[in-house]
Amino acid sequence: MTHSEPHPATLPPLDEPTRCLVRLAAVIGAGTERQVRAFLLEARALPPDWVEEVILQSYLFAGFPRTLNAAREWRRLSGAAAPGADPDADATVMAEEWRARGQVTCAHVYGDMYEHLRVNIAKLHPALDHWMITDGYGKVLSRGGLDLVRRELCVVAICALAAQDRQLHSHFHGALNVGATPAMVSGTLDALSDLIDDDSLRRYRLLWGHVRTAHTKLAQGKV
């Protein structure tokens, strides 16, 4: 299975490795350096590719400084050297493929809202539309090493801890669209309960409830 395709929802509500991963994603994006260090220590029990990919994708949501800090700490704590090369990151040969697979992955994530999204982002700036597809969904979120369901759950986690409500709403939908079960999304919020203040967590659970209800009605043909 390529990672531009939905991943079958065969996970339990939130298995312990995935719980560890979403917590790591959240603190890389919006936690303290001490939290990042502590959660990376725990992450040594995870498949290394998962950790590498969560660190790499964090630059889309948290910027290069936090990504570089996490990567540096991961190299130190894991003792694992960086790969000697990464052909999938070479723009001179991959640019066209990034755009093609980015369109596919973004369409999976946004479903029926995909065309509307493209129009709205282009109205903000055409460069943002190009970068969203080519860099965000093509170059980064379509990489191998981590399935799209876990990637989306990690995006939910980072948006929640960073208090990015609008993006959180979008990626609640996105997680369901790519195959996450409602229990997985609920489990992701539960995994952050010691990191997010009670008022915010209550608000996010309410928002998630609205999204879940909307998806249920859509599946039943009631809307």
Predicted regions and their residues:
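Acidic, glycine/proline-rich low-complexity segments that act as flexible tails and inter-domain linkers
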Residues: M1-R19, G29-W50, Y59-L148, N177, ...
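Accessory, usually C-terminal, subdomains that scaffold auxiliary metal cofactors
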Residues: V178-A183
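Short conserved catalytic/interaction loops centered on acidic-Pro-aromatic/His motifs
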Residues: F39, D165-H173, S186
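Short, glycine/charged-rich beta-strand-loop motifs at protein surfaces that mediate ligand recognition
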Residues: A157-A162, A175
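Alpha-helix capping and inter-helical loop/turn segments
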Residues: G31, A163-R166
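Beta-strand segments within the central parallel beta-sheet cores of soluble alpha/beta enzyme folds
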Residues: E52-L56, S186-D190
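Short, structured motif recognition centered on aromatic/hydrophobic residues
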Residues: L21-V27, R151-C159, T188-L192
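Short Gly/Pro-enriched loop/turn and capping motifs at secondary-structure junctions
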Residues: A160-Q164, D194-L195
